[in-house]
């Protein structure tokens, strides 16, 4: 596909979140794709003066290439709603819910989507006792890209209970989500334009699909399509579409899973749905789009077109909805 007119697009990237460097890579990839298609691009590195910079640029649309706070948690979405500027990806309410892993569970689990159990814990309490039986996972409530994730096992060198001086997310975050560790395989499915594209299996060479494994070339093998039974592929696509719909995502999203293949269908669990998935050359959404026959440039333009269509369908300047 190709947009029927040339646009002025602000690509919003960077910022101050842990995922700044990833966002810069995503944003630059998007900007080059748009320029290749003849669009005018203004690159803006997110800072406290971003509203004034966007107003001065006066774009047709903003491509939100930010990851993490404040570009993924509803802050930027609310600002752009108030400014009356069309923007890509999900809206304010969806972003607020999806970045919070506990709020996401409250939306998805009652509607039949399986997610790991667990609970919110105070980091200070970890130095007294484990919140769950080992092995378990500790992760920030409001971060993506496996930032700050720790797997606590009997063999880990964190101590038992965890030592105060042991390096881990408890040193950076006051609150963490503790979940049982699910043995098995890492799977993911992207949704673009209401279609679940494929299922990819991620095989990190480090043994865990962490931040470095995600964004360092050669650290993770991507198997697309995944070598999994047809019924698991169908379930992954079904859950990705349902999560996209229930949360009110738009444009694109990516749902991540752990699958204990010894448990069959019962071993598949949704970990999270990402409303701002990466758009770097290593990223999973472009990879699955290519598998589905969509070029990188077509993918970027499709996301922009979805944003413009949504904005045109709105009534008023601030939709305030989850779509």
Swiss-Prot record:
GO biological process: cell wall organization; peptidoglycan biosynthetic process; regulation of cell shape
Any one GO molecular-function label of the UniProt entry: D-alanine-D-alanine ligase activity
Record-listed E.C. numbers: 6.3.2.4
Enzyme type, top EC level: ligase
Residues reported to bind ATP: 131-188
Listed pathway(s): Cell wall biogenesis; peptidoglycan biosynthesis
UniProt KW Transport keyword: no
Entry keywords, A to Z: ATP-binding, Cell shape, Cell wall biogenesis/degradation, Cytoplasm, Ligase, Magnesium, Manganese, Metal-binding, Nucleotide-binding, Peptidoglycan synthesis
Nuclease found in the keyword field: no
Source taxon at top rank: Bacteria
Protein name: D-alanine--D-alanine ligase
């Amino acid at each position: 596909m190709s947009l029927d007119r040339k646009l002025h697009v602000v690509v919003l990237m960077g910022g101050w979140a842990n995922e700044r460097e990833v966002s810069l890579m995503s944003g630059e990839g998007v900007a080059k794709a748009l320029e290749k298609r003849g669009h005018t691009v203004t690159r803006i590195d997110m800072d406290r003066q971003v509203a004034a910079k966007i107003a001065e640029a006066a774009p047709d649309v903003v491509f939100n290439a930010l990851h993490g706070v404040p570009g993924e948690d509803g802050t930027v979405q609310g600002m752009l709603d108030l400014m009356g500027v069309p923007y890509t990806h999900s809206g304010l309410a969806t972003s607020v819910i999806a970045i919070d892993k506990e709020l996401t569970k409250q939306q998805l689990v009652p509607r039949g989507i399986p997610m790991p159990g667990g609970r919110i814990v105070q980091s200070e309490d970890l130095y007294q006792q484990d919140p769950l039986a080992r092995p378990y996972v500790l992760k920030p409530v409001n971060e993506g890209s496996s930032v700050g994730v720790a797997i606590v096992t009997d063999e880990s060198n964190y101590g038992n209970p965890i030592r105060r001086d042991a390096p881990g997310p408890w040193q950076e975050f006051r609150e963490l989500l503790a979940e049982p560790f699910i043995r098995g395989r890492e799977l993911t499915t992207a949704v673009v334009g209401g279609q679940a594209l494929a299922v990819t299996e991620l095989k990190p060479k480090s043994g865990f699909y962490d931040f470095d494994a995600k964004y360092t070339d050669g650290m993770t093998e991507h198997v697309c399509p995944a070598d999994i039974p047809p019924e698991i592929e169908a379930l992954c696509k079904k859950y990705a579409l349902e999560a996209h719909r229930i949360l009110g995502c738009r444009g694109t999203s990516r749902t991540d899973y752990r699958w204990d293949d010894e448990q069959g269908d019962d071993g598949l669990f949704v970990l999270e749905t990402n409303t701002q998935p990466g758009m770097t050359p290593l990223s999973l959404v472009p990879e699955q789009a290519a598998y589905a026959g969509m070029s990188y440039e077509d993918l970027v333009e499709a996301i922009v077109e979805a944003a413009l269509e949504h904005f045109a369908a709105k009534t008023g300047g601030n939709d305030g909805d989850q779509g």
